[in-house]
Each structure stands twice: as structure tokens, then as C-alpha cells.
Amino acid sequence: MKRAIIIGASSGIGFEVARLLLDDGWKVGVAARRVDLLQTIGNVSEAEQIDVTDPNAAEHLRSMISQLGGMDLLIYTAGIGKQNRELTEGIEVQTTETNGVGFVRMIGEAYRYFAEKGEGHIVAVTSIAGTKGLGPAPAYSATKAMQNVYLQALEQQAHARGLDIHFTDIRPGFVDTALLNGDFHYPMLMQPEMVARKIMQAIKRKQHICVIDWRYHLLTMLWRRIPRFIWRRMKL
């Protein structure tokens, strides 16, 4: 039986992916800050409270891997994101610590484990927000760009070392989860159940980059072609 661990599985995308993996016959371990919500997923083998900003979080992941009897797949869906047009320091720092430091801590630990094992698959839910610097959410878009590049760097390193480690960078747009501010109307809003199904397809195909929904794929292609002198004048 294949074994998967999901970091950030208490709600939204991670929650739905956990349910699909269970239906597909995987042995699943789940982790999040809100451990009480993990109990509602279903017949998971391990449920652990992990805060990715905790310096000891990587040790907790190692312990979880041991309790599960090993790991073949790591899915990382943890993260925060807020609009911060006033550039409030606390929001920027918290976002960077969670999406930056926390991401490196947990993805790095999974990579080291798979390097010892010789094979594995790391899947991370990042965002299309990493495509360009977004003025309404500076730290969020910056950390998402960092996540994209970090996965690419690890993929190159793994290949250079002859390691059979696969990487899948999942880049959704707006998803109807608690991460979004309910007072704002988000265009092209997607449901987490649909996103989870797309993630499962990407996992089975060992897809390198998966932009969820063709509309967001076209949008990011357009963004990349906008010159900087025009981009800085755009109101988002």
C-alpha cells in the first residue's frame, strides 16, 4: 500500500485531497495546526498537529513518517495569504514565515527523507500569484514565486544527484476556501473538490507544473507577456 502525508489537511484543498487518496486505496497521514478538524476526514492512519512555523516541525514530520511506516508521497497545502495594501508589518512577516520559512522547512525535510530512500514524490500547492508581483498582496505573491523557484531548484538538484524524486507544482487561482476574504467578490472562483480532482490527475501523471483551470493558464500566459512599465501602472 502506498503511503502519503498531507501537510495542511484540516480544510479546503488538503482536506479534499486526503479524502480522494483514501478512496484510491492510499495509507494516509494528515497534519495541520487545527488537529481537531483532521478527525473529520475519515479513516486516516495518522493525524498530527504540526505548525510549519515551529522550529521543531520537521522533527514532527519525521516522527509521523516513522509512525506511518514510511512515505511515498508528500503533499504540501499549508499556507496563508492576505491582501495588505497598507503593508502592515505583522502581515508581511507572518506570511513570509509561513509561506517562506515554513515551506522550506517541511519541503526540505521531505526531500532529505526521499534522498535517503532514493525515490519519492513531492507535491506542493503554490499559486498563480507567483507569476508576477501583485501590489495588493506583496508578501504573498513574493513567497509564492519563491516556492515555484525552490521546487525547480530541488528538481534540478535531485536530477544531478541521480535521485528518483518527482516534483509537482500545483498552481491554482482563486479557490473557495477559508484563505479568501469573504467580503470580496473573486472572479473565476473554483471549488476545492474540483481542484482536488485535478491534483490527483497531476499526481498520477507526475506532472511538473499544473495550473488549475484553462482560464488561469491563459491568464498567467498573458501576465508573463506584459512589460514591466505597463504592469506597474495596472490597477489590481
Where are these regions (language model features)?
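Rossmann-fold cofactor-recognition segment
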Residues: 42-56
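Active-site helix of classical SDR
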Residues: 107, 143
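N-terminal Rossmann NAD(P)H-binding glycine-rich loop of SDR-like oxidoreductase domains
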Residues: 10, 18
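Conserved NAD(P)H cofactor-binding loop of Rossmann-fold oxidoreductase domains
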Residues: 77-83
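Residue(s) in the substrate-gating loop at a strand-loop-helix junction
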Residues: 127
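Short alpha-helical oligomerization interface
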Residues: 84-97
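C-terminal helical subdomain
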Residues: 169, 184-219
